[in-house]
């Protein structure tokens, strides 16, 4: 079983009881940065083994994690903050699990763009999450111009 576990954004207390329980009971926690995740795990006295799973090892580590999942191991996927699979390499292992009929359970929690949307005070019945803006000035300016012409609320990082 693959558990997609949302983790706190900034405040370690912003985690669900269910997330703590899952992190304590799985066989392995796959995290973007084991050093960062260790802070959360230490705070809650969680001693589950961890392994790194990040942008540059997602293909090889993804195959390794898939092998463990097919052997019946339970793995929790966490990102450094927020919900795995949103603008991080988590989508890759989730996709592998879906393609290989691995059972997936989502443990909800913080997602930065939802917080931004709600706190904006803008209408939320129709919105676009545009992800990260381009780094280059001209591309960023062009993207902002395009987004400003939309008729609904836009959230981006």
List PLM regions with ranges.
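Conserved helicase motor
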Residues: 51-60, 132-137
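Beta-strand/loop-alpha-helix module characteristic of Rossmann-like adenine-cofactor folds
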Residues: 5, 114-157
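Short active-site oxyanion
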Residues: 23-29, 102-104, 153-154
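Short phosphate-binding loop-to-helix
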Residues: 55-70, 89
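Glycine-rich, flexible N-terminal cofactor/catalytic loop recognition
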Residues: 1-55
């Amino acid at each position: 079983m693959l558990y997609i576990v949302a983790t706190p954004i900034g405040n370690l207390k912003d985690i669900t009881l269910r997330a703590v329980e899952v992190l304590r009971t799985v066989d392995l926690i796959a995290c973007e940065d084991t050093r960062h995740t260790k802070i959360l795990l230490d705070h809650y006295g969680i001693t589950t083994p961890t392994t790194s799973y990040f942008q540059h090892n997602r293909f090889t580590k993804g195959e390794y994690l898939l092998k463990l999942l097919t052997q019946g191991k339970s793995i929790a996927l966490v990102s450094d903050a927020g919900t795995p699979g949103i603008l991080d390499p988590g989508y890759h292992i989730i996709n592998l699990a879906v393609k290989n009929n691995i059972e997936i359970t989502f443990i909800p929690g913080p997602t930065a763009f939802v917080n931004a949307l709600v706190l904006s005070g803008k209408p939320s019945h129709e919105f676009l999450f545009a992800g990260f803006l381009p780094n280059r000035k001209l591309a960023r300016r062009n993207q902002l111009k395009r987004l400003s012409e939309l008729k609904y609320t836009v959230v981006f990082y």
